[in-house]
Amino acid sequence: MSARLLPPRTVPELARRRRDPVSKQALAEAAPIVDAVRAGGEAALREYAERFGDVQPGAALFHDRAALGQALARLPAGDRARLERVAERIRGFAEAQYRALCPVAVSVPGGVAEHRIAPVERAGCYAPGGRYPLPSSVLMTALTARVARVRDVWVASPKPRALSLAAAAMAGADGVLAAGGAHAIAALAYGAGPIAPRDIIVGPGNRYVTAAKQLVGSAVAIDMLAGPSELTVFADDAADPGNIAADLLAQAEHDPEAIPVLVTLDPGLPDRVATELARQLRDMPSAAIAQAALANGGVVVVASVDEGIAACDAIAPEHLQLELRDGAGVAPRLAHYGALVVGTGAAEVLGDYGAGPNHVLPTGGTARSTGGLSVYTFLRVRTWLRIDDPAAARPLLEDAIWLGRAEGLEAHARAAERRLGTLTS
């Protein structure tokens, strides 16, 4: 296969080619912007938004519910119907996740221990603009926050088009900030104009967005530090090389730093996919971006299904797509991925565009330790301890006294001892 398209790689080589999602340069450039917006609020936010071309001087920086509703009302009927259909699938999946949650109550000596689940109050949802404005990301983030019962939801997106504003209305957002980059993240974190400081900021963005999320991470929760988009396709000799090429290109066109990978049991498949890649690139508008991304990824040829599973788990990609005769049998054996796509009629793009599961997913191998955006991202588990029968709680008090002294924390032991003393006095 041509080295200019999808070169042969080993799994360790692919791991070495991954970059940290937050570079020193991006941090250095984002930090003064974040500090300025934190100190200067709306005035500083507007200055940066106009400087970076998010809005024209004097143009609206904040779109309230009324403006979003107008954008939705002006949407052509066909576009609105399709957007509603996508939104309903995303909402339905998120609602099913929410229904799976339940409170917990466990009896303890003298009382009960509980956990209760509650949403954060304010969420900020970032949706990329720039090269490819993503109304799908507006739905994936803001709609999921609303399903989680978040009270106050703002979206930030640079140069939002009518479709993105309409998507925000459909998601139930309270408003849209027409700005991106580090200044938008700072506005969400610390507040600016009508935006109160957020409790959590979610959503994918460029390296400056990601750097800013790291910078504000001590003041506000964040979902993840996302790097370039990734797709790994695990295929055998029954796979359609044209479909594989199309799916790899769909991921590659996101970003010249995207990482498309083919893991295959068939040594001949890479050449067939290479032919398809070259053919499909000829008339693709984003060919230059996609071709640059293909060079970041590669092909890993494996000798067995077990070796292929090990390779996929070591890569731990954002998206993992199975093009195997027994994909359904292999799927449960895989451990590390952000989203898994299985079946001859399935494609990763269906997950991107609203089959139901969320498309905001972990990258850079972090799928080993975390999952994608969901209603759980916006929820807090709060624990309760209630003691109704102090006499029955004696074992708790005795154990607390013992542990306090075992750890050298005498005040802890004495606090428990006082309660025990009231039972014997």
Model segments located where?
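N-terminal Rossmann-like NAD(P)+-binding subdomain of aldehyde/semialdehyde dehydrogenases
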Residues: 1-121
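Short acidic-hydrophobic, aromatic-tinged amphipathic segments that line or gate anion-handling sites
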Residues: 1-10, 175-180, 299-304
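Conserved small-residue-rich beta-alpha loop and adjacent elements
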Residues: 104-167
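Alpha-helix C-terminal capping segments
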Residues: 140-151, 169-171, 189-195, 213-215, ...
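Conserved NAD(P)+-binding/catalytic subdomain of aldehyde/semialdehyde dehydrogenases
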Residues: 172-261
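A glycine- and small/hydrophobic-rich beta-loop-beta segment
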Residues: 250, 254, 262-337
